[in-house]
């Protein structure tokens, strides 16, 4: 089994040169459709990344000197994704692409409009918490729920585009096409992560928080129509996507037919054995309950995921979400509390995303030479090394210097982080069957959200920004665990970690 896995992982790289020679004979992807896909994805990710950055600033403003509201939002968002992520993946599998697009885009943008409106209402009356706490609490809950629904619907779009459409569009082409599309998609996400915080930070610093919330709601209102038009154009313009949609519909109808046959075969014997049924009625009820639980969407999705060959890389990637060492809500709120200007935080987040963009350029070059599997291990431990700077900042007495060390360590680590992310995603695309892609993608995102939820729960427990150093150490320990798991996966497949005989200093030792 391990030898087969190694063969499958390295197959695309072993044949890379031969397929490059045949690339000219392959049908090329319609350029206009690829551009439409990228542009639609950019618009969708811009809104999601803007909200991701802004919500932490809104919450720390509404409840100063505490990470409580910020962490509470994170708990609601991550909790919803954890509970419903696998179900979202199965829903996508059971729906046509057009229905998924409508559900994703309408739900995401409508939720963001409501969240932006609720924030504006909170900011219009600065003393609302003391004047009318029930109204304040209601608006905060509305912000949390609508924001969480928006992020959950974004999950559907991420699974659809990153895990399905990109793979379908690249079928019949050389592996380099899939690698390039993965890199561009990740680059678009990181570009949004780079630019949206900078622009939002400038609006907040030089205009107002209220203006940023109004701008965000207006963006969601306008772009939903453009996004739908772009994605529908891609659907209609790429035959491979239409054919994949037809295969999905066929699988769905066959699955329903099998369930019907199974139900019939279960009940027919019962009609002929009524007396036996009465004697074992209570036991049958228990068995039926257990069967329903085992056959539920949630359990079957997780069972599917755990049976995949890439489960260890997936868990390693998910563990990286159990961290505050990113420009997420908790770290952003802490930096704001420490007195770092909002536009500086936005620029720092932008630099971090810029470093991540470099990963999308470096990854295709690296994986073509040493495979996605080995690229993953090298990129992971380079990220880990950069995070040592964040750990070192704990013992720096000057708060401003410590804050800038924290930001620098996080920003530098993004190169390794996003290369590792790309390496794991490509392994999933290579090794997960087409029929399981959306389900596995949904569970993967759910697992990531579960770990993110745990990080936010820690933020509630350790809500004083002065104690952020505790969260830093816990996060670093979790990242280390993720690296160990991925290294174990590498060793299981390759039976070794390094080619020690290729190291000059050890060459004589092996020769002797």
Swiss-Prot record:
Tell me the Gene3D superfamilies matching this sequence.
MFS general substrate transporter like domains
Give the CC-aspect GO terms: plant-type vacuole membrane
> Which Pfam family, just one, is annotated for this protein?
FPN1
Where does this protein reside within or beyond the cell? Vacuole membrane
Loss of this gene results in the following: No visible phenotype under normal growth conditions, but plants have increased sensitivity to nickel when grown in an iron-deficient environment.
Q: A GO molecular function for this record?
A: iron ion transmembrane transporter activity
Q: Which UniProt keywords apply?
A: Ion transport, Membrane, Nickel, Nickel transport, Stress response, Transmembrane, Transmembrane helix, Transport, Vacuole
Task: Tell me if Phosphoprotein is a UniProt keyword of this record.
Answer: no
Induction info reads: By iron deficiency in roots.
> How does this chain sit within the bilayer?
Multi-pass membrane protein
Ranges annotated as spanning the membrane = 55-75, 105-125, 133-153, 187-207, 214-234, 310-330, 343-363, 376-396, 405-425, 442-462, 468-488
Q: Where is this region: Disordered?
A: 1-28
Q: Which GO terms describe its biological process?
A: cellular response to iron ion starvation; cobalt ion transport; iron ion transport; nickel cation transmembrane transport; nickel cation transport; transition metal ion transport
General function of this protein = Vacuolar transporter that is involved in the transport of excess nickel into the vacuole under iron deficiency, increasing cellular tolerance to nickel under iron deficiency stress response.
Similarity comment: family membership? Belongs to the ferroportin (FP) (TC 2.A.100) family. SLC40A subfamily.
**Other facts:** Plants over-expressing IREG2 show increased tolerance to elevated concentrations of nickel.
Q: Mind telling me what this protein is named?
A: Solute carrier family 40 member 2
Q: Which organism is it from?
A: Arabidopsis thaliana (Mouse-ear cress)
């Amino acid at each position: 089994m391990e030898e087969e896995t190694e063969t499958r992982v390295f197959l695309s790289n072993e044949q890379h040169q031969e397929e490059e020679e045949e690339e000219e004979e392959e049908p090329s992807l319609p350029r206009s459709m690829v551009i439409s896909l990228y542009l639609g994805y950019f618009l969708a990710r811009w809104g999601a990344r803007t909200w991701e950055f802004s919500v932490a600033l809104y919450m720390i403003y509404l409840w100063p000197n505490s990470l409580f509201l910020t962490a509470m939002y994170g708990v609601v968002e991550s909790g919803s994704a954890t509970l419903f992520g696998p179900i979202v993946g199965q829903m996508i599998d059971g729906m046509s692409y057009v229905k998924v697009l409508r559900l994703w885009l309408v739900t995401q943008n409508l939720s963001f409009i409501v969240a932006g409106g609720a924030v504006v209402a909170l900011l219009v009356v600065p003393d609302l918490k003391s004047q009318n706490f029930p109204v304040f609490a209601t608006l905060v809950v509305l912000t949390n729920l609508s924001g969480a629904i928006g992020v959950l619907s974004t999950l559907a779009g991420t699974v659809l585009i990153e895990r399905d459409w990109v793979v379908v569009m690249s079928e019949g082409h050389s592996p380099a096409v899939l690698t390039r599309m993965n890199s561009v998609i990740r680059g678009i996400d990181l570009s949004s992560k780079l630019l949206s915080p900078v622009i939002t930070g400038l609006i907040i610093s030089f205009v107002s928080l209220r203006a940023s919330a109004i701008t965000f709601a207006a963006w969601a209102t306008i772009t939903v129509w453009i996004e739908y038009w772009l994605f529908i154009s891609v659907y209609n313009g790429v035959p491979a996507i239409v054919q994949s949609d037809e295969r999905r519909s066929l699988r769905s109808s066959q699955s329903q037919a099998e369930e019907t046959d199974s139900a019939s075969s279960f009940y027919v014997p019962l009609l002929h054995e009524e007396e036996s049924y009465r004697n074992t009625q209570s036991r049958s009820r228990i068995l039926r309950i257990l069967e329903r639980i085992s056959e539920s969407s949630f359990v079957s999705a997780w069972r599917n995921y755990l049976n995949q060959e890439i489960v260890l890389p997936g868990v390693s990637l998910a563990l990286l979400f159990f961290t505050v060492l990113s420009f997420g809500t908790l770290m952003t709120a802490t930096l704001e509390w420490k007195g770092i200007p909002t536009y500086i935080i936005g620029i720092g987040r932008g630099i971090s995303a810029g470093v991540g963009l470099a990963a999308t350029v470096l990854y295709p070059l690296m994986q073509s030479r040493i495979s996605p599997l080995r690229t993953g291990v090298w990129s992971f431990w380079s990220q880990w090394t950069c995070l040592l700077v964040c750990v070192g900042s704990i013992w720096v007495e000057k708060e401003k210097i410590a804050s800038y060390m924290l930001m620098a360590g996080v920003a530098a680590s993004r190169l390794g982080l996003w290369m590792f992310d790309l390496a794991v995603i490509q392994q999933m695309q290579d090794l997960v069957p087409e029929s399981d892609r959306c389900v596995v993608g949904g569970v993967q995102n759910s697992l990531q959200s579960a770990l993110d939820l745990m990080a936010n729960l820690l933020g509630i427990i350790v809500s004083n920004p002065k104690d952020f150093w505790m969260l830093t150490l816990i996060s670093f320990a979790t990242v280390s665990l993720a690296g160990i798991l991925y290294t174990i996966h590498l060793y299981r497949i390759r039976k070794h970690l390094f080619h020690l005989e290729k190291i000059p200093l050890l060459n004589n030792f092996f020769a002797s």
